[in-house]
Amino acid sequence: MIGQYYSAITPFSTGGQPVQIYSLVNEGVPIGTASSLLVNRFLIYQLVVTFYALFMFIIRFKLLYAEVRLALPFVVMGCLINVIILVMIFGFLLNEKFIRNILEKSIKILYRFKIVKDIKKSEEKINNTLLDYKISIEELKKDKKTTLQLILVSIIQLTIGFSITFFVYLALGFEKGHFIDIIAIQSLHYMAVSFMPTPGTAGAAEGGFYMLFKVIFPKKILSFALILWRFIDYYLRVLVTGLVTLIDFICRKRKIPIN
């Protein structure tokens, strides 16, 4: 819950993991174990959400191409970024030197454009991150049962999250079944906007919803559907997780057992 709150309010959802590590360490979990747990979770989640969206993209390509062709470049770009990230991470196991060379050259290019300020610091950070990923992948390979359980949980989590729009659809009085279409479009919407640098992908999430879901909702209802979906999916989540974070903070200050 605490991680969800900080992920929701920080650019690129970068605030969640450090806070979760801090929270776990405070509970007595060694920092190495805490980091490994979260890296494992991230790897599984990225793997599942990427293949989930790609599968939906394939089975609903005709619908997307016919009705929301203008949004396809954003969807393809989002999918491509996720695939590249996964290829780099898992490719590190197969050819560590090759992946390191690519990343080092990328950092130098970014330095020339003044996007990266300190080359050595950036290289050190990437090397540490790659090492964490390597260790985590080895752990996932050893414990196949837990890995399969994490994959299943991630699929269920994503399906529930992507189903919010379907229940918004029903709440607005529509009865005709569009469940798979909505799940497919919502998963691709997630891929298209997930790398936007604003907290909660603000702006991109709304614009993407409007572009993609016009095939599902009538134009006169689309704005209401957008507002209702955004409130449930983002603002309600921030409210609930923020409240939990506040309670956790108060309990820690007063040293009250949270359990």
Regions flagged by a language model, labelled:
Residues L24, T129-K141:
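A short amphipathic helical element positioned immediately N-terminal to and/or at the very start
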Residues R112-L131:
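Short, membrane-interfacial amphipathic segments enriched in basic
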Residues V29-I31, T146, E175-I180, P218-K219:
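Membrane-helix interface segments
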Residues E138-L152:
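Membrane-interface helix starts
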Residues Q149-I156, H189:
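Alpha-helical transmembrane segments of MFS and MFS-like solute carriers/permeases
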